Structures are given as C-alpha cells and as structure tokens.
UniProtKB/Swiss-Prot annotation:
The gene is rps2-1. It comes from Tetradesmus obliquus (Green alga). Residues 38-97, 127-186, 197-260 form the TRAM domain. Keywords: Chloroplast, Plastid, Repeat, Ribonucleoprotein, Ribosomal protein. GO terms for biological process: translation. Residues 1-271 are annotated as: N-terminal extension. Signal peptide: none annotated. CDD domains: RPS2. It is found in: Plastid, Chloroplast. The keyword Hydrolase does not apply. PROSITE patterns: TRAM (PS50926). Belongs to the universal ribosomal protein uS2 family. The lineage of its organism: Eukaryota, Viridiplantae, Chlorophyta, core chlorophytes, Chlorophyceae. The keyword Iron does not apply. This is Small ribosomal subunit protein uS2cz. It holds the Pfam family TRAM.
Length: 532
C-alpha cells in the first residue's frame, strides 16, 4: 500500500514537472510557431490517451498546447485519430496566460487494415468506465483530506472528503492510467431522511393563497413539492404574507407554525438599520459627553480604535502584531459613540415601552436641551397619557412632589396676570396687522391699475410705430395754441389795464371839476342869503 502511494506521488510530481516544462517550452517557442504547428480539420494524428472523462471520452494532450478529446477509447492506448473540430475554450492557462485550445477527433479507420490501437505495457488492464458505482472501504488517508482505496497492485481510487474505515458507495468521475477519481454518493433513503432532518427548524416566508384549503384548523400549502399544514394563529387570513417554521417533516407532508404576519426580509431590515444609522449620524447623535466627564459604566458604548505595534517577518513577508491597544475615538473633545450599539439599545427600549403602553401605563418625557425640546413636546402630545419636561428639571419633581405643588399654587396667579398682559399685546398686534393688510391691499389695487395702463400703452405702441410721434405733435400743437391764447389774453389784459387807467384819470378829472363847482356854489348861496 505504501509503495502504491509513493508511486502515485512520484507519478503525480513527474507528470506535473513534465507538464510545466512542456508549457514553458511552448511559451518560449510560441512566437516562432509556424503554420505547421497550427492544426486543421482533417489532420491525422497519433496520440496517447492519458485519461478518461465523462461519457468515457479519452483525453490526450499535444506538445503545441492542444487538448484532444477522442470518444470510444481506453486509458493508456495509442490511437491514430482524425481531427474534426478545433475551437478555443473560455478558460485560460495560468502558466501561458492564453486561452485553452480544444480538438475533437475520432478514431481513423480508413486506409489501413491493421488496428489503430496499440496497447502499451502501462495500458489499463481493468475495464472501468466513468459513472460506474462501487461499494468500497477507505483503506488509507490520502492528500488534502482524501481517502485511498486500492483496487489492484497498480490501481487506486481517490475519494475526497472521507475518513479511514468508512464503508461508502462511490461513483467514478475520471480515470487516469494508475488511478481514478471517485465521489461518495448516498442512497435515496439516506438522502430523504437527511433532507427531512434538514427541513425541521427551517423558516420560510410564504403567501397563503386565496385557494388554500383548511383542514382541522390549519391551512394546506404546497412548498418545495411537499404539503405543509400551517396552524392558524395570530389572526392569519388568506392572501397574507407570513413567516413559518417547520416543526415536523416526512417525505410527503410537513407541519409548521406561524412566527410572524407580514414579516420584513433580512435585506429590508438591513436597509432600515442603515437608514436609521445614517439619520443618527446626520443629527450628530454619535457625539457623546466631554471626554473628561465620561462615566466608567458607559465605556462599553464608546467607539474604540485599535492601534497595533507590529513587525514584518523576513521569511514570508507577513505582518505579526506584537501589541494591540484600544483607544477611544475623540472628536472636538467628545467621545464618539458606537451608533450600532445605540440603535440596538433603542430597539430594546422600544420593545419595553410597547409592552407598558399596551398595559395603559403613563410616561414622562424629559429633554432639557434646546435641540431636543421641541421633539420631546411633540412626542409627548401625541398620546393623552404622557407628560413632558423640556425646559428645566426641578429638583424633587419625583421625590418631593408636595412642595412642588405648593410652589405651583403660588405661581398660578402670576401666570394669570401674565396671560392677561399677553392677550392685550396680541390684540394690539392684530390691529396693526389688519392696518398693514389694508394698506397692502390698496397698494396692490393701484399697482394693478398702473399695470393695465402700461399694457394699454404698450399695445398702442406695438400697433402703430408713429404713435408717439403723432401724439407728441398733437401735444406741440396744443402747446402752441395755448401759447397763442396766452398771448391774446396778455394783450387783452394790457388793454384793460390801459382802459382802467384812462377811466381812473377821467374820474379824477370829474372829481376835480365837481370840487370846483362846489366852490363856485358857496358864494352864490351866501349872496342869495344876504338878499333875502
């Protein structure tokens, strides 16, 4: 057995070394290849079958890098074949860094009466085929956690992922000259039992169809070829998405219970957590208290960064850490909190609050910082059974409530007076607002009128280009007419003034004449009086 294993290892090492040399030589001479090295359909070759693949197809390798596939052959035979198809594969050779070349050929039976098969001394004496099944016992441990099964003096089965002493059924996958690769297979019954055991405890997200039947207080649903009896619970109805867990399973049916109604998938949960964490970071929730005021019990919720002192080894250039120290991350003089842990704590707190809310308990919301004050008030006002403190926490609000009630009774009259003053101020403000609104309304009306006039002028300008010129000429004519009328009026006023002056002169002359007449009358009167 030891000699077989040694021979197998030697053959493997020799084959790999020869293959590397061949590939390297081909890589060196690749630039100097001629048209003779390139194969064509119809070429006749003599190849040696080194392995058998699926469907008993022989595999041979050529020096120019081609892999020849020949059906209906045996491992170890030299065969004369005729090339039928040549194509390049999708894979690449890691040594040559080029595409793998494949050749499909068939055994050439034309032209010669002699046999095309030449059996060598190393040809396979046993008639094994790919796909055959055998029950074997693992005799010895092989390389890479594989098991070795000796079939004859010069032939082995290599079975991966097996242990020494296991009695299993194997199926041949590939045949080489002195060994074959096989994989372990299980019987159908073992597979069914294993599948049933694997099904128990598994969870599935399903939609209960509208056509689902109900038998003995449970829905009947078909899942992966099995009939699953889902117990009715949590108020489930038809066409609901539910999360179920398999409790019992057989080959044809299974029993399951409902865990959740309309569950959230893991991807959606991750997306929701990601969104919440981003919002927390955007609202600066990752900044804690000052580093000096840190409480020792809260250190587990701080974000730490690792600093390691290391060295590189000379042998494999690997980094080996000698000392690792944890230091808290500090920004702006404050500790950076682990937001993931805070999110988990929020989720746990939410569960507890939901339980208390379902029982009808009352809550007190406290948030005295300015950024949180408005949010605390809004959240507290959403429920009728909640109270909040968002300005300043008074000492003894929970422990000494009686004294606080007394101080509240003293403050109430002051608050009433304050409310009256505020009402007066608000009334004055309302009056001022009304006046301002009225003024704004009037200004809007005036502006609308100006807009209408402006639109009318623009329309007239667009209709006639000479509109302004004509209008200006009319204005000039009217202006000239006014000037001429003014001149006439001035002349008339001058004439009137002259006439007035003349009339005044005449009046003065008449007055002077009247005075003289009166002077003449006085001696006449005196004379008459003397006569009488």
């Amino acid at each position: 057995m030891e000699t077989l294993e040694k021979n197998f290892k030697k053959e493997k090492s020799v084959f790999s070394a020869a293959k590397k040399k061949k590939n390297l030589s081909f890589a060196k001479n690749e630039k100097t290849t001629t048209l003779k090295d390139a194969l064509q359909a119809g070429d006749i070759l003599t190849v040696k079958i080194t392995a058998l693949g699926s469907k008993n197809i022989g595999v041979a390798e050529l020096k120019n890098g081609y892999t020849v596939l020949v059906p209906n052959t045996k491992c170890g035979d030299k065969v004369q074949v005729k090339v039928e198809k040549i194509f390049l594969g999708k894979g690449t050779n890691s040594i040559l860094n080029q595409k793998i070349k494949y050749v499909v050929a068939r055994v050439d039976n034309s032209g010669t009466k002699t046999s095309n098969f030449e059996k060598t001394s190393n040809s396979l004496k046993f008639d094994f085929k790919v796909g055959q099944k055998f029950r074997v016992t693992i005799a010895k441990k092989g390389p890479k956690n594989s098991g070795l099964v000796p079939v004859a003096k010069n032939f082995l089965f290599i079975v991966p992922n097996t242990k020494v002493g296991e009695n299993i059924v194997v199926e041949i996958q590939k045949i080489k000259q002195n060994y074959a690769f096989a994989k372990p297979i299980l019987s159908k019954q073992m597979n069914v039992v294993q599948e049933n055991n694997q099904m128990i405890g598994q969870q599935f997200h399903i939609v209960i169809p509208s056509s689902a039947k109900t038998i003995a207080n449970s829905f009947v649903v078909k899942l992966n070829g099995q009939f699953v009896f889902v117990k009715k619970s949590l108020g489930v109805q038809l066409e609901d998405t539910v999360k179920i867990q398999i409790q019992k399973s057989t080959g044809t049916f299974a029993l399951a219970k409902i865990l959740k109604i309309s569950p959230i998938s893991s991807k959606e949960k991750k997306a929701m957590v990601k969104e919440t964490v981003q919002k927390m970071i955007q609202s600066s929730m990752h900044f804690g208290e000052k580093a000096i005021r840190c409480n020792a019990n809260m250190r587990k919720y701080i974000w730490y960064r690792k600093k390691g002192l290391g060295m590189y080894t000379n042998s494999k250039n690997t980094f080996v850490s000698i000392k690792e120290t944890k230091k808290p991350m500090v920004k702006r003089g404050r500790h950076v909190l682990n937001v993931l842990k805070t999110q988990r704590c929020f989720a746990e707190a939410l569960k507890q609050l939901a339980k208390y809310a379902a029982k009808g308990k009352t809550f007190l919301f406290v948030g005295t910082k300015k950024p949180a004050a408005s949010l605390v008030a809004k959240t507290a006002l959403l429920s009728n059974t909640s109270f909040f403190v968002n300005t300043r926490w008074l000492g003894g609000m929970l422990t000494n409530w009686k004294t606080i009630l007394k101080s509240i009774s003293q403050i109430r009259p002051i608050l009433k007076q304050k409310q009256k003053i505020l009402q007066k101020i608000l009334e004055k403000r309302e009056k001022i607002q009304r006046r301002l609104f009225n003024k704004v309304y009037l200004l809007r009306k005036k502006s609308q009128k100006f807009m209408i006039k402006g639109k009318y002028l623009i329309q007239q300008i667009l209709r006639s280009k000479n509109f302004l010129i004509e209008k200006s000429q009319k204005f000039i004519q009217t202006k000239n007419a006014l000037f001429s009328a003014n001149a006439l009026l001035l002349n008339a006023s001058k004439n009137l003034k002259m006439k007035k002056i003349q009339i005044l002169k005449q009046i003065q002359q008449l007055e002077f004449a009247a005075v003289e007449i009166l002077k003449q009358k006085q001696p006449i009167k005196s004379f008459n009086s003397i006569k009488s």
